[in-house]
Amino acid sequence: MKTYIQLLLVALFLPLLSACDQEDDVIDIFTGKTWYMTYIAVEGQNKMYDFWQNDQDAREKSFKTITGDNYTLVFEGANVNDVAIGTFSGKATSTSVNGDWSANGDNRELKITIKNGGGTDGDKYLGKAFMDGLKSAFKYGGDNKNLYIYYKEGQTVKFISFAPQRNSGN
């Protein structure tokens, strides 16, 4: 009976000992996959922002650029002193970019420093927004199945939504 009670106490307290850490596993979120853009929206919304201001032809032309390795990001890095740091590379439509990144799992702060590329993209709507978003990124959200990079455009906070590209490791 005494052994039964001891086992019961261990079973009851085991979840407390292995409680989930609220800090993100930032390396698991960012690395090991190619992220492709799924949409760009205003924070709190989940529909594509209307960069085209109801110009359906321009919208359709932009959406045709969402193919192949366009609008993709690849992060490499390691965890150093509880902050993930590393390098990244990406591509809009005609513009490639690479540089350094760091992310803090405690407060979800994201810093992206572009070292090469990042100029004007061939698509003046989605391509421009993609590059602007990387340049002014300040936080992230998501997990290893969805990544949201938040950026400010004036007083408006927008985010770029990403999903892992098929056959990219996840």
Predicted regions and their residues:
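N-terminal hydrophobic targeting signals that begin at the initiator methionine
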Residues: 1-2, 21
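Sec-dependent signal peptide recognition
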Residues: 2-10
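C-terminal motif of bacterial Sec signal peptides marking the signal peptidase cleavage site
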Residues: 15-19
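Lipid interaction determinants
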Residues: 20-170
